Amino acid sequence: MASASLLKTSPVLDNPEFLKGQTLRIPSVAGVRFTPSGSSSLTVRASSYADELVKTAKTVASPGRGILAMDESNATCGKRLASIGLENTEANRQAYRTLLISAPGLGQYVSGAILFEETLYQSTTDGKKMVDVLIEQGIVPGIKVDKGWLPLPGSNDESWCQGLDGLACRSAAYYQQGARFAKWRTVVSIPNGPSALAVKEAAWGLARYAAITQDNGLDPILEPEIMLDGEHGIDRTFRVAQQVWAEVFFNLAENNVLLEGSSLKPSMVGPGALSARKGPPEQVADYPLKLLHRRRGPVVPGIMVLSGGQSEVEATLNLNAMNQSPNPWHVSFSYARALQNTCLKTWVEGQENVKAQDFACAKSNSLAQLGKYTGEGESEERKKDMFVKATLTY
């Protein structure tokens, strides 16, 4: 966790308006600022990988393609395997991951795949390196680098994301193994505030992660997930998302992160999962686009939205709605369950069925990225809600 002395004062969260209605009051942290004498100009840090970082970001943001998130921890993967009666063994994880990445033609619709560390170093059941299979399909390999969440002392029962220790060495090793982008997922809970401390911690961690991974050749995906837990409406989600992203970009600037060599992975802005007020795709699309226009210019090549537990069809319809009018960014998907759920269910019917479903789900979201998805002919299985209340591990 970032120490209090490292957390800069923020023009966003130090505004008392943000603290209204919260049970926890966080005093402003006195940040040390150095003002050079005489005239000066801001120099944005650019590592020796700058050109490659920009190229990677643009490749991931190529038209009609998005990200397959298959970075579940071994424990979470075990829960998914258990749902179809399989044991959580390395052999079963290897077999399932092999099926996910080996669907013929998958690279037409998937530009990047986020891997768990085991997968990055794993071979397929045919003995080929997973990374090589992806590259042959034109899919950029990525890696999850955070180490999960722990309780955040002094907060409203909120969490902080660990993993900065040793990140530089790990990033360098992942690059050598073939990874070209990274993912760091931190979470913000609306029912618990969110407190100013939790938002500052999330933003600072994301910024430090981004700077470290860029220095080692990995394009950072920035994912401050606004959790779906709660009964709040969409306007409450929107207000919190604005505060979170403002704080994130403030800290990215403080850490001289090269935005052209990064990607954003925002939550779709919708009501809480327990809210009775569910909006149509057009409304769910309008709020995140409004947020992005207010908080981020077009310098970031790709906006890869996460599904956050929505059903496969709902997530695809919402993405399609976001692409009904021109955007200054590539707005696409970075889905895990929304791409995998039906594939997993069909595994018991045969391996080829998994590949077919994998291809079909990716194609549907490719159409949504192009604004051409209709939702016609989708199975009832793909329409099932997949919300699961957040825990401190994943």
Swiss-Prot record:
GO terms for molecular function: fructose-bisphosphate aldolase activity. Keywords: Chloroplast, Glycolysis, Lyase, Plastid, Schiff base, Transit peptide. Transmembrane segments: none annotated. It catalyses: beta-D-fructose 1,6-bisphosphate = D-glyceraldehyde 3-phosphate + dihydroxyacetone phosphate. The record marks Y394 as: Necessary for preference for fructose 1,6-bisphosphate over fructose 1-phosphate. Pathway: Carbohydrate degradation; glycolysis; D-glyceraldehyde 3-phosphate and glycerone phosphate from D-glucose: step 4/4. Its EC number is 4.1.2.13. InterPro entries: Aldolase_I_AS, Aldolase_TIM, FBA_I. It is an enzyme of class 4 (lyase). The keyword Protease does not apply. NCBIfam families: FrucBisAld_I. PANTHER family: FRUCTOSE-BISPHOSPHATE ALDOLASE (PTHR11627). This is Fructose-bisphosphate aldolase, chloroplastic. The lineage of its organism: Eukaryota, Viridiplantae, Streptophyta, Embryophyta, Tracheophyta.
